[in-house]
């Protein structure tokens, strides 16, 4: 029930456009936004940071002037992003957008899955408590083995290489002194209340490899090293973005641990591995997801949006 004088404006249609790095999501999203008179919510764990423009392949200022983008330039480099933050920003965008359609565009599919399935609220911690917990976790020789010892049920659900989820589980343990599985029982997930139509780009392997090579070369030509150098001087070395592809290799170059040629090769290789993981995730982790080429997805989204609008 809406209280008198309090109206939440939400887009009538939420459409997610997913796809691996280098698949052409950004270019297609701009085209679609223009044709559908839509706005764009950026679901990207790097574009959310200020001052990371080249490494994140962030939309240009001209593109952003013509089409409203949300969740760009929101965090400083030394702040952390997570699924809960993206959910909050998405709900904020839904409230303020006056358009019929909001396109959710990005490669951070794990965050979208977490939002759709629902998030359990994390314990509220002060900055001092966060630092203390981070130190505790850093002293563990094998975080996964420790998690297994305190909460076998939770450890069973997490792959030993899934450092993100292991870390989150241990944060809960140190913050609450409760096994994470018990904490989640007491704080159940709340599924997302709004329907999101899911589409994902699937690009042929050789074409994707060529896109990634061209993109990497372009990033280096546009000043990637200079961009990361400015951040490396200014911010703590353990800041979350310094672990991202394109950034971490540039740091190794700045530390003279890679040559320029090795830097380019490392970014290409790591991006291709990431793209493979993203593709697999999109294929296996979503129900009712439509996958196809750029042309197929463009046609499917336009048809889906326009028929839906006519029905209303």
UniProtKB/Swiss-Prot annotation:
Residues annotated for ATP binding in this entry: 19-26
Uppermost EC category: transferase
InterPro entries linked to this entry: Dimethylallyltransferase (IPR039657), IPT (IPR018022), P-loop_NTPase (IPR027417)
Source domain of life: Bacteria
Sites annotated Interaction with substrate tRNA: 108
Entry keyword Magnesium: yes
NCBIfam families: miaA (TIGR00174)
Name of this chain's protein: tRNA dimethylallyltransferase
Species of origin: Helicobacter pylori (strain J99 / ATCC 700824)
Name of the coding gene: miaA
């Amino acid at each position: 029930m809406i209280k008198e004088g309090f109206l939440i404006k939400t887009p009538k249609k939420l459409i997610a456009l997913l796809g691996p790095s280098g698949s052409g999501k950004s270019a297609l999203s701009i085209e679609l936004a223009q044709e559908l008179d839509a706005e764009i919510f950026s679901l990207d764990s790097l574009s959310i940071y200020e001052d990371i423009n080249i490494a994140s392949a962030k939309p240009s200022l001209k593109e952003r002037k013509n089409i409203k983008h949300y969740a760009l330039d929101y965090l400083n480099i030394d702040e952390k992003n997570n699924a809960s933050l993206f959910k909050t920003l998405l709900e904020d965008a839904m409230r303020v957008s006056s358009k019929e359609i909001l396109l959710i565009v990005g490669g951070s599919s794990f965050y979208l899955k977490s939002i759709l399935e629902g998030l359990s609220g994390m314990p509220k911690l002060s900055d001092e408590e966060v630092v203390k917990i981070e130190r505790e976790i850093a002293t563990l020789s094998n975080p996964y083995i420790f998690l297994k010892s305190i909460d076998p049920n939770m450890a069973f659900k997490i792959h030993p290489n899934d450092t993100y989820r292991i870390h989150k589980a241990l944060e809960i343990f140190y913050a609450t002194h409760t096994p994470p599985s018990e904490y989640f029982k007491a704080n159940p997930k709340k599924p997302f209340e709004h329907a999101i139509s899911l589409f994902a780009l699937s690009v042929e392997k050789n074409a994707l490899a060529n896109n990634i090579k061209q993109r990497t070369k372009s990033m280096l030509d546009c000043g990637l090293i200079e961009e990361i150098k400015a951040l490396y001087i200014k911010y703590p070395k353990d800041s979350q973005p310094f672990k991202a592809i394109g950034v971490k290799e540039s740091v190794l170059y700045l530390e003279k641990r890679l040559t320029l040629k090795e830097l380019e090769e490392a970014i290409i290789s790591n991006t291709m591995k990431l793209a493979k993981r993203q593709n697999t995730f999109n294929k296996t982790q979503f129900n009712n997801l439509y996958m196809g080429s750029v042309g197929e997805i463009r046609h499917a989204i336009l048809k889906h949006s326009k028929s839906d609008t006519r029905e209303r």
